[in-house]
Regions:
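N-terminal pre-catalytic "stem/leader" segment of glycosyltransferase-like enzymes
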Residues: 3-131
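Extended catalytic core of nucleotide-activated donor transferases of GT-like folds
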Residues: 50-55, 67-69, 100-188
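Short hydrophobic "strand-cap" motifs at the C-terminus of beta-strands
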Residues: 69-70, 156, 181, 200, ...
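Conserved catalytic-core segment of nucleotide-activated headgroup transferases in glycan assembly
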Residues: 80-88, 96, 206-291
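Residue-level recognition of beta-strand->loop/alpha-helix junctions
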Residues: 100-102, 201, 263-265
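Donor nucleotide-sugar binding/catalytic pocket of nucleotide-sugar-dependent glycosyltransferases
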Residues: 176-187, 194-209
Length: 291
């Protein structure tokens, strides 16, 4: 551990400095090169995680409760996922607090639903870490080893592909068990670890705003509509909207006026290539809608 901790501290300092200097760096160095350097730091940190000795769980060392760690304010699917988990805790008998961890600049972060639960400390004996394995080394550097020690550490992960990147395997070392929202993800992760992997689906409530009806989105009122939505930042290959379009085409012909498929892309302005790729697949289907 003594050999690993200095690297973690230096890596965290380097990343923080890089983010502080981002406005200057992006003018001098190509974004692709900056991303590559950051990826190297994360990769080195991930490898060193396997050498880090986490003090085993001591139930009585801290108060009973849950420290929920992740980007609770993020206006993304991952942020909403964390808020759904927080909503479950809010309606349970468990004491909990939120540590708002994110990788700067963090994108749009305007959600204030759980601002009242955010603290800079994690006083409870369970860490529920809503951070995907690709960023877990950064979270470990940011939160610190002390927050991991003597606590029961649970990762809540989302990864919808069957193959799990080998460079992420060291992330398992930091956890006692893993939770996922679907059995598909759980089955895939169990192939890579002997640690417990549980499926805990979301508890979803969906309050509707009457202003945002089908007329608002220029969608037909008299059709059964399927919805496929994703964030361009999550990658087209991973979210697979083209697969949804192909499945719809196989199930229904272009003249079918009883059904429709709605494709909704978040942050579409950041991926014109994705939009063009999707439009080429619409192929004259008037019952496929893009919003």
């Amino acid at each position: 551990y003594r050999k690993v901790e200095p690297f973690m501290s230096l890596s965290k300092a380097a990343l923080n400095m890089a983010e502080a200097l981002r406005p200057v760096l992006v003018k001098l160095i190509p974004q692709k090169m900056l991303s590559a350097v950051k990826a190297k730091v994360i990769e080195k940190g991930a490898k060193d995680l396997e050498k880090t000795e986490i003090t085993p769980f001591e139930p009585q060392a801290h108060k009973k409760g849950i420290n929920l760690i992740g980007s609770i304010k993020s206006d993304t699917g991952l942020g909403q996922s964390m808020r759904l988990v927080a909503e479950i805790l809010e309606n349970s008998t468990w004491d909990y607090t939120v540590y708002d961890y994110f990788v700067p600049p963090g994108g749009s972060r305007t959600n204030e639903a759980f601002d009242g639960k955010i603290t800079q400390t994690g006083p409870y004996n369970i860490n529920l870490i809503h951070v995907n394995p690709s960023e877990l080394p950064l979270a470990f550097m940011d939160v610190g080893k002390k927050q991991w020690d003597t606590r029961y550490n649970i990762g809540y992960w989302l990864w919808e592909l069957e193959e799990f990147p080998k460079e992420w395997l060291p992330a398992f070392h930091l956890l006692d068990e893993v939770w996922t929202p679907s059995e598909f993800i759980s089955q895939n992760l169990r192939k890579y670890t002997d640690k417990l992997v549980y499926t805990l689906p979301y508890s979803v409530t969906a309050p509707a705003d009457a202003a945002y009806d089908r007329d608002y989105f220029h969608l037909p009122k008299d059709r059964f509509l399927f919805l496929m939505m994703y964030d361009s930042g999550s990658g087209m290959v991973r979210k697979n909207p083209l697969g949804a379009i192909e499945a719809f085409k196989q199930a229904f012909d272009r003249e079918n006026k009883q059904v429709g498929l709605v494709i909704k892309m978040n942050r579409s302005e950041q991926s014109e290539k994705d939009i063009e790729n999707i439009r080429t697949k619409l192929d004259g289907y008037d019952n496929i809608y893009f919003i």
